[in-house]
Amino acid sequence: MAKLTAVPLSALVDEPVHIQVTGLAPFQVVCLQASLKDEKGNLFSSQAFYRASEVGEVDLEHDPSLGGDYMGVHPMGLFWSLKPEKLLGRLIKRDVMNSPYQIHIKACHPYFPLQDIVVSPPLDSLTLERWYVAPGVKRIQVKESRIRGALFLPPGEGPFPGVIDLFGGAGGLMEFRASLLASRGFATLALAYWNYDDLPSRLEKVDLEYFEEGVEFLLRHPKVLGPGVGILSVCIGAEIGLSMAINLKQIRATVLINGPNFVSQSPHVYHGQVYPPVPSNEEFVVTNALGLVEFYRTFQETADKDSKYCFPIEKAHGHFLFVVGEDDKNLNSKVHANQAIAQLMKNGKKNWTLLSYPGAGHLIEPPYTPLCQASRMPILIPSLSWGGEVIPHAAAQEHSWKEIQKFLKQHLLPDLSSQL
């Protein structure tokens, strides 16, 4: 009798799961299926086919998928290959504190396209819980002065290294990365800056004094370890993160995921100084064969390494980690990161690290998150292409998440060895 097992059954979303099937016939082919519904009831699903060993066992840590949504040895393939039933869907966890994702795993007889797969019951099934927050993490709603967001504190007395988490063009408040980072020991402020609560509904300008207030708010908290903080940022959030690192002396470590090294849309303003946006050329906005918009060719002015529009990154005192998806269809992130690095090197700076991933797209998220190659952006335009190939994108997410944490710890925690 077939038996499906998964260890652990309940874990954080960035933790791997060991899946096995035992009790099969020797060399039997079995179909493994995974599915979940998000908080709006949207279905995401994946499947892969495996052949049992001579003793009737399948172990995803060692055995290759023969077909389905991925091929080869990929222990977590059922998770990162999940696809939305509705086109242009993106898996985003909104309520991180009160409920996990429930992922249903089934071991089934293989089927052919013309068969009715409902007729055959599964050989075995189970349900996994995938949490975005560890036990003991506290969430504090933030509405202080102008600041809007959510502060996540790890369990314990602290103090903990502080990080500000910034997302991009979707607006609103995204909490899933901040809650997960707090689960790994960082006091993390998910900071909203437009299209949320009483904040502006459109990003007409980037007021850096607002973000400075966010930094000061975080550093005032008794459980936050000063004197500096880190930034974790993506897309327009990374544009703002870079601007903060240049202008705010408290920024010690900045993670820039697929961001520009210039102002892309709305001007940045700080104490009267204005950083104007780069002129974009609409001729280079491409609608691909699937009807998805690709923006990555639009900022041709920045191709010149001495472009007057580039941020003066050499003025920053902290360290940078550039995370680049080389198949990004929203920004030419590889070019922009290399341009910023060249600017640092020209000024004798060595305060940077580059992680560049072939085949990875724009939305590099925590490990095992399904690749979103395209999604709707109703506030901007109907649909955007984010790029990325499933397997290399998954590998980039797993590797970069570990490196991001190492980078933040390296530059935000005191060097105890120097005190010995």
Swiss-Prot record:
Catalyzed reactions per annotation: choloyl-CoA + glycine = glycocholate + CoA + H(+); hexadecanoyl-CoA + H2O = hexadecanoate + CoA + H(+); choloyl-CoA + H2O = cholate + CoA + H(+); chenodeoxycholoyl-CoA + H2O = chenodeoxycholate + CoA + H(+)
Membership in a protein family: Belongs to the C/M/P thioester hydrolase family.
GO cellular component: cytosol; peroxisome
GO BP term (any one): liver development
Subcellular locations according to the entry: Cytoplasm, Cytosol; Peroxisome
Entry annotated with the keyword Ubl conjugation: no
Cited Pfam families: BAAT_C (PF08840), Bile_Hydr_Trans (PF04775)
EC number(s) on file: 2.3.1.65, 3.1.2.27, 3.1.2.2
Subunit structure: Monomer.
N6-succinyllysine: residues carrying this PTM: K40, K346, K350, K409
PANTHER family hit by this protein: ACYL-COENZYME A THIOESTERASE-RELATED (PTHR10824), BILE ACID-COA:AMINO ACID N-ACYLTRANSFERASE (PTHR10824:SF18)
Key words of the record: Acyltransferase, Cytoplasm, Fatty acid metabolism, Hydrolase, Lipid metabolism, Peroxisome, Phosphoprotein, Serine esterase, Transferase
Record Gene3D superfamilies: Acyl-CoA thioester hydrolase/BAAT N-terminal domain, alpha/beta hydrolase
Tissue occurrence: Highly expressed in liver, kidney, gallbladder, proximal intestine and distal intestine. Weakly expressed in adrenal gland, lung, brain and muscle.
Protein name: Bile acid-CoA:amino acid N-acyltransferase
InterPro entries: AB_hydrolase_fold (IPR029058), Acyl-CoA_thioEstase_long-chain (IPR016662), BAAT_C (IPR014940), Thio_Ohase/aa_AcTrfase (IPR006862), Thio_Ohase/BAAT_N (IPR042490)
Primary localization: cytoplasm
Active-site feature positions: C235, D328, H362
Its biological purpose: Catalyzes the amidation of bile acids (BAs) with the amino acid taurine. Selective for taurine conjugation of cholyl CoA and only taurine-conjugated BAs are found in bile. Amidation of BAs in the liver with taurine prior to their excretion into bile is an important biochemical event in bile acid metabolism. This conjugation (or amidation) plays several important biological roles in that it promotes the secretion of BAs and cholesterol into bile and increases the detergent properties of BAs in the intestine, which facilitates lipid and vitamin absorption.
Modification type Phosphoserine: residues: S125, S418
GO molecular function: carboxylic ester hydrolase activity; choloyl-CoA hydrolase activity; glycine N-choloyltransferase activity; long-chain fatty acyl-CoA hydrolase activity; medium-chain fatty acyl-CoA hydrolase activity; N-acyltransferase activity; very long-chain fatty acyl-CoA hydrolase activity
